[in-house]
Structure formats: C-alpha cells, structure tokens
C-alpha cells in the first residue's frame, strides 16, 4: 500500500489504531519529548499534538516509533518484507542482465517498478500555498521542540535537506539535525562524508565564497522521508528510490527561491543558502547515544523563504538513549541491509545491528565459513562495503548456526570458539563518529573485530592450540565469593551459557585506573585465572544481567584499542580480554567526556499526573 502524502499515511495509521491525537495543551519545550519517549518505549502509537502551547501548528512525533510503522511507510505489511527492498537496492547497485527468457520474466516486476522511478514535475503545489519571505521569515512561529534540559537551543530534526553539487543532475536528500540560532538562521550539522557536505565542498571549490542554495522539507510522504535514510546507490536519487517504494513517480516542484526541486507532499519548506564563510558553534545536545555531545563548528543556513500548506503539520522527533526513533529506524533498515551485504558476500547468513549499540556501533554477522581466516575477510567487508558502517566500532562474526539476535547465543560462541587474544583484531586511527566522545580525538578512533567462528585446523595450528576451550575445566566458581574479592565490586553476573568464561563486573568507580585494580584482584582467584576469557567492567548505573545495558556501555564508553586489557595465555592461565566499559576520568582520556542525559524529576512528575488523561496506551 502506498501513500500520496503524510496526511494519507496518518489517516491509515489512525484507522489501524497507530495514531493518537492529543488535544490537551502540551509544551514543545521538554514535555513532548517526555511523552514521546514513554510512548516509544512502550511500543505505542504515533502522536499528533494538536494544541502545542504557544503555537497554532500541530506537532507530529513518533511517526516511525515502531519497526512495523517503518515497514508500512515503505509500503510493506511486515518488517520481514523489507528484505525485498534490500534485494531491489542490491540489484540496482549491481544489476545483472537476464540470463534467458524465464529470468527476464522473473525480473519483470523489478523492471516495472524501475519505470516509476523518474520524478514528475508540477508547476503548483500545496506546500507553497503560504509563503513567508524577508522579514516575514520567523522560526519562532513554528513549534520547534526543545528535547532535553541541557540542550543549548531548540532543534529541528526531521527536515529533508535538499542539495545539488555543481554540474550534477542528481539532487541529494539527507536528514541532518539543525540548531535554531535566530528566527531566520539554523546550524547545519552534517558529517563530512554525507551527501550534503560533499555537495557543499564541491560548490566551494568551483564557486569560492558564493552562497550555496539549500531547501529543507518537513512532513513529506513516508516513502520520500524513508528514502532519505536508506542506503541508496550513489547513482540513484532518493526521489527515484521513493518512487520505487511507492509504486508511482515522486511529484516535485521547483523551490520558490532557487532551482532545487522539493517534494510536492511536504508540509513546510525552508529555503535559503549557506555562506561558505559563516560558521557557528553547534551543541551541546542530548543525542542518540544517551549523552550530550561536544560543541563543534558547522555551517550556518540562512533562511530567505518559508513555504507551507494552509494549516500545516510540523514533523519532529527527539534523540536520546536507545531505544529512540533513530534506533527503531535502525532495526527496520537492518532488514534492508542484509540482502545488500549478501549480494557482495553470499556467505553471510544474517547481519544484525543491535539498537542498544546506538544503531550502528556494533554489528553481529553470521556466516557460512568456507576457509581459514574467512571471518576476518567478512569483518573488513562490513567496514568497507557500505559507508553506513564506516563508523561501526565492533564486528562480531559467528557461524551460521548462531542466532545473531540472541546475546546468550553470541556469548556462547565467543567463549567456546575464541582465543581472546589471537582471535581479536584491532585497527587504530580509523574514521569514527564525531559524536563518539570515547575516541581519542574527534572523528578518529579504533575498531575491533571478534572471530567467534569454529576454528579450522590451520587456524588452530597457527595458534599452537589443540582446542579453543582447553581451559574450560570444571573448577569451582563461587560468584558470591568473587564479589568479596575487591571492595569496589557491587555485582557480578556470569551468563549460564558461558561456563564461567564470560563475566560482567559492576564497580563503584571513584578514580582512574580502578578497572585494572579490580580485574587484577579477580585474576588471583584460581577459577578465574584458569577458566575466564572475557570480563566486562561497568559502572553502577548498568544492570549487570541486562544485555541492552551492557552493550550500550561497551559501545559508548570504550575506544576498543585503548580500553581493552589483554593477557596472553600460558600453561596456568587462559588468554583474557577485559572490556573497560566504565566512564573515564580525565587522567584516562584526551578529550571531554560525555555528560549523560538525565530527566527532570519535576517534568516527570507533571507528565505522571497527566498520563491517564492523555489515554495513549
């Protein structure tokens, strides 16, 4: 099923009980975030705040707050059907000619869909019924959300930023967060490898100092929105892909003030330019990691025109500790990634980006292993094949029999099949998300690969081992006794599947270096010395038996190379890795550490008192 615009999609969701209209007045400053966060974590509906305090424009949040709604937006009934979308993209990335008449017939549905890819250009559009220009331009009239108490300013989040590089026919659509700094200015935070930033770079090289035209569309139809967050091939425009998803051509209209084409289905459009010489400090903001990011300088977008429908809807979201809407999108798009990766690496059985790993910082891959060292080839492939994974810090590779989406199964494979030292790969000074405060410097850090596949004879020979589980003897293992080994230990969790070879240790850290102090005390215990392979050390704010908490701590509080302690094995001691997933003190790091997002107790109490009245769940 396809949808011509956002309102068509909302009507469909409402009929299915997947949209809740909130008529009670709600403040876009913080209150909408608290309500949206509770709703998303409960798997609840999209929310339409019809009476935002101080504004006449309703606010839509949590539109893609479940993977099922993402699938609906892509014209699918079930999340598993998104693999078909991935198959299309894999085909478009590397098309193969038909091998015969039957194969041509099999490919016919794809060819028919491809015919819907070119855009349809219109002269008029509802998104230009109202036009503000010059002094009329005023972002203060739009209910831009303030999400967290320590955010520096209101934040625009769901705009489709439309750019075109010089001498390029294809436009680029991207979604970048945008800090409001004046009634006609926002900061455009885009990473250097993203399409909009690349278009600006090319423009600055060809037209030094000249304004770079930009348009930003809010509230387009779901296929166009989701097309902007999907890994489409570089040769394919997001508008064309949206047409493929929708089954009909994407309708566009020329911007009121520049030559960029905007989606006819949009609710609100910002138009203007970026002065290549104008920068401003962006942030800090509470981000999808669950922390506030550092300040960074980014280009300023000056708005000369705002166009909109009559009685428009403002589409917004928040980001915070997962799960949030970006994490949910990651879960759904995970199904799109699988066929694309399998096209290049047919040996891959499954691929999983756990949402607790901030959508992309950790990947688990299962594969049909075919030769010694095969797992390392797959690791390299994940890091290099799609630019979406250039910031992935951890890649765990397991055999096809392992359930990539079950942490107990993955940990069991790690403990049974790995020599922690020899089967781990570290690569330093690689591209890392600039929001990753655990990296030594902004944008540059390390990656880690873990080969948890069953080892072949050649691999064991190289390791000088006869089995990969030689230290898994049945020596007594008393968790309560281990807790008493060091006064900083507050809890220890040993997964039942790990036979004592994997443990999570919670400590009450008060100064630098205490992780090493604790594990060195544990290593003096004979059972730990001989049997244990992996220890994860976390702070007291992490639940030791909750994999979501554990993986979140590992992916946000570690630089793999710096924060992994290594012990080579010997006849009396098993090889060991310690993941120091604690918050770091200034003596342990070289840059400012992230500040965790914390909710305002007064705001929580206020929403508690009104919760039943909202009737959301």
UniProtKB/Swiss-Prot annotation:
InterPro entries: UbiD, UbiD-like_C, UbiD-like_N, UbiD_Rift_dom. It is a peripheral membrane protein. It is found in: Cell membrane. Its EC number is 4.1.1.-. Pathway: Cofactor biosynthesis; ubiquinone biosynthesis. GO terms for molecular function: 3-octaprenyl-4-hydroxybenzoate carboxy-lyase activity. Belongs to the UbiD family. This is 3-octaprenyl-4-hydroxybenzoate carboxy-lyase.
